Amino acid sequence: MKKKYIIATLILILVFSCGKKNKRARNSQNNVTLENKMNDKIKELTEKANKGDVEAQAELGEIYLQGDGIKADYKKSMEWSKKAAENKNYRAMRNIGILYLEGLGVKKDYKKAFSSFSSSVDGGDAQGPRYLGIMSENGLGVKKSLDDAEFYYEIGDSSGDLVSSYKLGKLYEKVGDYAKSIEFYKKAEDRIDKTAAPMYEALGDLYANGKGVEKSTKEAREYYEKAIKSGSQEAQNKLVKLK
């Protein structure tokens, strides 16, 4: 009987071990497939970019900046973004601003960052205003001004940029206007993505603490769960502590 038990246990261990190996093999294979697809995409975009395709140049700049599916290369990001910016591509101008703002591959230069973001906004880039707002809110290279930050975030919000909407919500929360902050947080609607995650988490916080709304563990839990589905680890921690 004991012998049969030992054999059965060994079989289970073997099956479990094989399962883990197969999972690792599948994950490795998926990573290789994604990498190959991205390499093919970069090759195609590079061919177009070298022929003067401005959109291809801007997209290459963004891919190398974000490191999506490949290793980030800030030097190449700047190179391609500058080529596109020379031809009035406003997304490229914004990405140049990010490189200077964060000091990615270049020395931090808030003046150049602000100038690049301003150019992108002048051209109608929807995401550019959020960065001007962030710089104004935190006094990065410009005089710290919540009024200016609000102004820029409102431009972004009116262009449909949810990050600007979230930033506006946080500004109103700072001054105790919770009703207004909730209005902006709820612009996430039923989206489930990383942009919406902090908005759901913020709503969960307000309901958990009864700020601007009647305290409701049920509502807080629902918003934290949405935030978790959208990729927030912090919301997971808050949900565990929720009483």
Which residues does each PLM region occupy?
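C-terminal motif of bacterial Sec signal peptides marking the signal peptidase cleavage site
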Residues: 15-17
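Hydrophobic face of amphipathic alpha-helices that form TPR/SEL1-like repeat modules
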Residues: 59-66, 70, 95-102, 130-138, ...
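Short helix-capping/linker turns of helical repeat alpha-solenoids
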Residues: 50-53, 66-68, 86-89, 102-104, ...
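Bacterial signal peptide processing site
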Residues: 19-21
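Terminal, low-structured helical/coil segments at or just beyond the last alpha-helical repeat
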Residues: 202, 211-243
